[in-house]
Amino acid sequence: MASPAPTVAADHEALLASDDPKLAANKRLVYDMYRIVLQAGLAGRAGEFIHDDYIQHNPNADQGLSGVQDYIRSTRPEREIKDTLDLPLIHLMAEGDHVMTSFVRPEKDASGDTYYSTWFDLYRIEDGKIAEHWDPMLKSDPKIDPNDKQI
């Protein structure tokens, strides 16, 4: 049974807004890291957003800032920086020092038909930079570029 794709957020700025300036800043940090590092593939700028001793819970990327940079360089080309995310963002929320994103994730079943799932990432912010990351990624070979998961 096929399920419909989750609804994508039309207004990213509304998702970035918060009455709490710290939460708004944390959401903006994660959003801009997605735009500049993950979407545009600019690994050299990762240090603007990510701690040197970054803790990574994705089994396909090594620890630390250098692990993120190596992963980005090995999975995607450099692209133009855009004002908004192309990835199908559903929601962006912050609580305390954590920011969570959710995206629509199109996949293919064994017969080649597209179905939709939801991908979640959780980030811990420390001293104005991303210090830790969790996601549901399983070991994969070859490494994937999430920019290929657009609807």
Per-segment meaning from a language model:
Residues 50, 105-107, 137:
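Short beta-strand segments enriched in hydrophobic/aromatic residues
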Residues 1, 118-149:
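Short beta-strand edge/turn micro-motifs at domain boundaries
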Residues 1-44, 48, 150-151:
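Short, low-complexity N-terminal intrinsically disordered segments enriched in polar/charged residues
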Residues 43-97:
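A solvent-exposed, acidic/Ser-Thr-rich amphipathic alpha-helical stretch
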Residues 77-81, 107-115:
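Short, cysteine-centered beta-strand-loop-beta hairpins and adjacent loop/turn segments enriched
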Residues 46, 94-98, 123-131:
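Short, solvent-exposed coil/turn segments at beta-strand boundaries
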Residues 87-93, 104, 118-123:
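Hydrophobic/aromatic beta-strand elements that line small-molecule binding cavities or substrate pockets
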Residues 73, 102-108:
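Generic short beta-strand segments
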